[in-house]
Amino acid sequence: MGILNKIFGTYSERELRRVNPIVNKIEALDEKMQSLKDEDFKLKTEEFKSRLEKGEKLDDILPEAFALVREAANRTIGLKHYREQLIGGVVLHQGRIGEMKTGEGKTLVATLPAYVNALTGKGVHIVTVNDYLAKRDRDLMAPVYEFLGLKVGVILHNLNNEERQEAYGSDITYGTNSEFGFDYLRDNMVVYKEERVQRKLNFSIVDEVDSILIDEARTPLIISGQGEKSTEFYKVADYFTKSLIAEKDFTIDEKANSAMLTDEGVNKAENFFKVDNYADAENMEIQHHVVQALKANYVMKKDKDYMIKDGEILIVDEFTGRAMEGRRYSDGLHQAIEAKEGVRVERESKTLATITYQNYFRMYNKLSGMTGTAQTEENEFREIYGLDVIVIPTHEPIARIDNADVVYKSEKGKFKAIVDEIVERYKKGQPMLVGTVSIEKSEMLSSMLKKKGVPHQVLNAKYHEKEAEIISHAGEYGMVTIATNMAGRGTDIKLTKEAEEAGGLMIIGTERHESRRIDNQLRGRSGRQGDPGESRFFVSLEDDLMRIFGSERIQGIVDKLGLAEDEAIESKMVSSAIESAQKKVEGNNFDIRKTLLQYDDVINKQREIIYKQRSEVLEGEDLKDQIRDMIRDVVYTAVNSHISGVEEEFETELQNLVNYLEDICLPKALVKVKDISNLSDEEIKEKLLEAVENIYIHKEKEIGEEQIREIERVILLRVVDTKWMDHIDDMDHLKQGIGLRAYRQQDPVQAYQFEGSEMFEEMIYNIKVDTVRYLFHVEVEKAPEREKVAKETSTNYDEDSVKKQPIKKENRIGRNDMCPCGSGKKYKNCCGRMA
């Protein structure tokens, strides 16, 4: 591969050779654009729109349109896209990922493809990681778009429905990944079509694309409503778990991020909860609470995974170190942490709607992204999103010096060396950005520096409000900034003249992250636009990466060398061991994301069907034909499922059939068994259908045509929403227990696909049954009002969607259990069809 790259160039270099002629055309139009009057720019926009309407393609007008934006930016905000930024713009327009280093002006680059694609009138979404960046970028670039005659909006967390509709109605809309995703879900929960805010998803430019499409890919967006379960059991499980002894009663698997009881722990659980067999299916509720309490107490770390603020548990984003206000762990883990920390335990929520970022962003007609670091994940971008990564050349050569890692035996020795390094460089006034992996480590380092008399700023989840301000000063002379991981990402660190002379920004990594990309992001904060700078990572054998995934050989070598805890080794072997540990973890995480996507694709296809059907109900003026189809399906399916063809049982089956339909849509005694006992199955269907349709026609006359159409819409929306919410729960429970199928030599993914499909078919049938039942039993006193079946109480990120424990709903009959009615059939083939 290396030899081929030398001969033909890398993939990016080959692709850039195709882009260069387009960029040459853009640059050649520079003089022409400079000669335009200010009022001509809006006229050019109208001209482009007209050309597109007449059949020209976006690529036909691209060189001229890009040249126009370039001149507009120069006149309005004093910034003119340089060649490399034009290349980046073309790459984004082509629906690819442009890898652009920090400080290369990604915000300005986005104006080029955003303008061109907005000319179609279908809207463009520019996605950032937080509200601050969305508003900042919109405010910075709005003058450019407005000068060109385009409208630009921004979606922020606190906007109401009307403001959101206005922002989405703009030509270009800035916003965060979570706001775009949640608005999509909310749009599919509205009861009037006028309440929807988003248009059809057209073109998206995702800033920090690796953070959103890879780091957060396992994070479903969840809109929750209030659950009914009591919270008392969380406290009981917490009390039990705190009485256990590590290793003896339970073990922790750090790689899987989980904890489980040993045989001795199981015995203790049986005694404590007074049950005979802890593993019994009827004790799943106990198992679930114990597993979550174990995880809360022994796996989840305060000030690393979560923090406490004003008596509330806040999730800390592991990638940015930011506190995620208003987000809760799902599946009872948040409640278990609340019980552990002795704060008020909130009720477990019910999922009303959910989607992952993977599936949300794959719905756009065209998707593109920008980031400083994407190449290490190129395979994943290509395989999951169909996006290739093109490395955009930097405007100035990178002058940053990346030093080799230094490795210490103990964490204590490592931090002593870090402090010594900081003190040494502080003396000469060199600014430093020190990256840590947790709030706890930030604060430990901070107290060590205080003892040495080194003034510094701490940037972590606890001080999120000051984030951008602190980061903007990090390049000043003598400034020391400690930051959790990627806090402050998206804000440039600009050097002062004195800081430049002192050596530029020094990056100190206090630990290697499990992803090389996150390390590269930290490094990339220094050396922007050809600035001087330096970086070095300090590693100890006690760090999580080395301890969990590192090689025992390294530990052996260090032991043989007899190193003191503050002695360092710099060795190629150690560096390559670190890299191979990172590759191992990256591969493992990619596999997890791929597997999760296979599971999520099942419910994603189902979601698309339900949301499409729901949309048709909202949009359609007349549901009469749809309702008549439902009536026919209910009657025909009832006949098919009740009549087995066994002569001796025929009379009984007919009576059961009549009873069943009387419960749904037949008035009592309208059809008697003797009326249909001499008919064939097909004749029975026609006779029953005729009777039911006559009642429907009578009801329509009685209520009035206009009003019954609205009643049908109200009923169908309520039934679809209720059944879909229950189905989400059912699919989640199926997924939680599906891993055990591997013990039966079954492929869990295939089993999930098959059973999930069966459950979906059942749900669709039950939607028809309930819709017909409610419609035939409706009594009208006043015009029906549409209302949501459940009230949204919160939005959520589920940080731990892997290896959840099954929860048992009280007194729930399994689909494959024998039906309690005594028919001798399985529940799913008997009363389960009617449930």
Swiss-Prot record:
As cofactor, the record names:
Zn(2+)
A single GO BP term for this record reads: protein transport by the Sec complex
Where's it found, cell-wise?
A: Cell membrane; Cytoplasm
Q: Does the keyword 4Fe-4S apply?
A: no
Its subunit composition reads: Monomer and homodimer. Part of the essential Sec protein translocation apparatus which comprises SecA, SecYEG and auxiliary proteins SecDF. Other proteins may also be involved.
Question: Which positions does UniProt annotate for ATP binding?
Answer: Q85, G103, E104, G105, K106, T107, D492
- PROSITE patterns named among the record's database cross-references: SECA, SECA_MOTOR_DEAD
Cite a GO CC annotation: cytosol
Q: How is the cofactor bound?
A: May bind 1 zinc ion per subunit.
> Which NCBIfam families did the record assign?
PRK09200.1 (NF006630), PRK12904.1 (NF009538), secA (TIGR00963)
By its UniProt entry, which InterPro entries does this protein fall under? Helicase_ATP-bd, Helicase_C-like, P-loop_NTPase, SEC_C_motif, SecA, SecA_CS, SecA_DEAD, SecA_motor_DEAD
- Name used for this protein in its record: Protein translocase subunit SecA
Any idea what job this protein has? Part of the Sec protein translocase complex. Interacts with the SecYEG preprotein conducting channel. Has a central role in coupling the hydrolysis of ATP to the transfer of proteins into and across the cell membrane, serving as an ATP-driven molecular motor driving the stepwise translocation of polypeptide chains across the membrane.
Which residues are recorded as binding Zn(2+)?
Answer: C819, C821, C830, C831
Q: How is it placed in the membrane, per its record?
A: Peripheral membrane protein
Superkingdom, taxonomy of origin: Bacteria
Question: What is the protein's major site of localization?
Answer: membrane
Give UniProt keywords alphabetically.
Answer: ATP-binding, Cell membrane, Cytoplasm, Membrane, Metal-binding, Nucleotide-binding, Protein transport, Translocase, Translocation, Transport, Zinc
Give the protein family.
Belongs to the SecA family.
Question: GO molecular function, one example?
Answer: metal ion binding
Q: Which reaction does it catalyse?
A: ATP + H2O + cellular proteinSide 1 = ADP + phosphate + cellular proteinSide 2
Asked if the Swiss-Prot or TrEMBL record annotates the protein with the keyword Cell cycle, the reply is no
